[in-house]
Amino acid sequence: MPGPCCNDKCVCQEGGCKAGCQCTSCRCSPCQKCTSGCKCATKEECSKTCTKPCSCCPK
């Protein structure tokens, strides 16, 4: 079963993806916390430091 906000894509809201979103193809705008203050060296570190890992995370 897809996540709660999955139809063709995730539902976005201000700050990133809608809460509870389990969609792996989600492409929401980066949240303010990440765009303003995320200085992480790795994707794993970013996911722990930021409330929602965003586009600031290393690929």
From Swiss-Prot:
A divalent metal cation 1 binds at C5, C6, C17, C21. A divalent metal cation 6 binds at C40, C46, C50, C57. A divalent metal cation 4 binds at C31, C34, C50, C54. A divalent metal cation 5 binds at C34, C38, C56, C57. Residues 1-29 are annotated as: Beta. GO terms for molecular function: metal ion binding. The keyword Metal-binding applies. Signal peptide: none annotated. It comes from the Eukaryota. A divalent metal cation 2 binds at C6, C10, C23, C26. Keywords: Cadmium, Copper, Metal-binding, Metal-thiolate cluster. A divalent metal cation 3 binds at C10, C17, C26, C28. This is Metallothionein-1B.
